[in-house]
Each structure stands twice: as C-alpha cells, then as structure tokens.
Amino acid sequence: MALSLSSVADVIARISTARDVAFGSYFLPEGPMRDALVGAARSGAHVAVTLQADPYRNPHGRRDNREAARLLTAAGAEVSLLRSARAPFHLKAAVCDGTAYLDDRNWTARGPEMVIADDDPSDVSIVRDAVREARPAADATIALRKDEALRREVLLVEAAGDAPVVVETERVRDSPLTAALRARARGGAPTTLVVGRTRHHSRAERRALVALARDGVVIREGGTNQKLALAGGAAWIGSGNATGAGGRSARQVEWGLVTRDAALVGAVRTALERDVASTRARD
C-alpha cells in the first residue's frame, strides 16, 4: 500500500480492532475519536496516547486534554501530557498495529481534513517513535519535525518553475516559505496563498500578508485550516503552519511529506480548488 488516502472514520474503525495503538494529537476533545480510544483500552488493547498539556492560547484544549487523560488512564491507557516548553508537540498521528495514519488537522471529523495511511515499516517505526516518545525524526518519505517538514515544502515551491502554486495554511509569518512564494510572484509565476480567517491577525501575520500581496501573491482568506501545497504534479501535505521554524519550534514534532502519487495529488488539488473558490480575496 505505502501511501494512500484514508479518513478519520477509517482510523476510528481501525482503533476498535487493533491490539496496539499509539495515538498523538495537539488536543483531544470529547467525541468519536476519544470514545474509540477509551473503548480500545477497556477492551484490552495496548493504547498509548500523547497530547500537548498546554496548547497555545487554547484553554479549552488544555481542559479537553486533561479530561481525556483522566478518562483514558481510568480505562487502562498510557497517557503522556507534554509541556510545550520541553517537548513542543503538534503532531496528529496514529499507529494501529502495522499501519501509520497522519492527519493535517486534529481528528475533528467536523470538516475537510486529509488523512494519509502508510504501511511502510520504516515510516511506521519513526511515526510510532514520534508519537510515543515525542522524538522528531525524518526519512525519505516523511519529516516528523517542523523545520524539516517546512523545508520540504519550500523546496517544492522553489522547484515549481512557472507552474501555478497554491498553498493553504491556518496561520502565516515571514519565513523561508513566504520568501519563496514572494520570489515566485515577483517573477510573474502564478502564486496563491489561502490563509485561515480570523478576527485579529497578529502583527507578524499582518506584516507577512502585506509583503506577500505587495510582491504579487494572491491572498485568499477563509478555507478550512488545512496545511497543503500544490505545485504542478506534486503536492505537500502536513500538519505544520507556514509560520517558520526558528528556535524551539524547529524541533516541534509535526509531520510533512511531498508526494507525486496521483490519488494524493488529486485530493490536494480538489481540496485547494474548493477552498480557493469558497474564500474571499484579502482587501
């Protein structure tokens, strides 16, 4: 199988039958995924769950993770709540027996998200280590640390030539990725950025958006908070925002991969076409 499209529903179903489950997320609210993990632990499966103890500016996520830890521990699961100062963890991944699953959002099932299944033993091994031990790593297929995941996205953009490039992110700041987008646009290559809508962009985000627009990048606000890039016949999919990876965030546990698989590239193209069409141009 190697890489293939999956879904949150598929992962929930797999958790219910797996004997060994390693699961990681930025936060885990009440819902079908939490219920599936609790049920698997109660049924005797080995379940190990890793969550960020203190999601950034997200008190609801902090409470959700504490409650999830309480319920999962009571059901017999192993739970790790990681403090961001020591182990920044933004990964959304699961390993069920011999298959790894990677999600670009937080297993919400409330809207579009991209879930990738991977049964390559090398990939499965490093994903399992990233989930269970918060160990950032990379192989030829997957990067599991933010700096390397975003570096691969930058390389995709830089290698696109005159082909149209579309990138979607929830948040954005000045970084090598925005520099690559600006350079393309200055040279006349069609370049679009879809960025999540918010009431209050940070000063750094406003500065990045102004610079991108000034150099000719088409900015669309809205989308679905996915993390995607499309450049010709190749695509990048991941969990990391286009905010750069300096300092502590360089080793943040994330994921990102570049693919030319026709089904995956087609899914990314469909998602980006949907989000470009449903968003508004930034004033």
Feature locations, PLM:
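Short alpha-helical basic/polar micro-motif
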Residues: A163
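Acidic/polar loop patches that form or flank catalytic/metal-binding clefts of enzymes
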Residues: V166-V167
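Charge-patterned, long linear interaction tracts outside catalytic cores
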Residues: A271-D283
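HKD-type phospholipase D/PLD-like phosphodiesterase module
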Residues: M1-R19, G24-A160, P176, A180, ...
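Long, repeat-rich segments with strong aromatic
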Residues: E170-R173
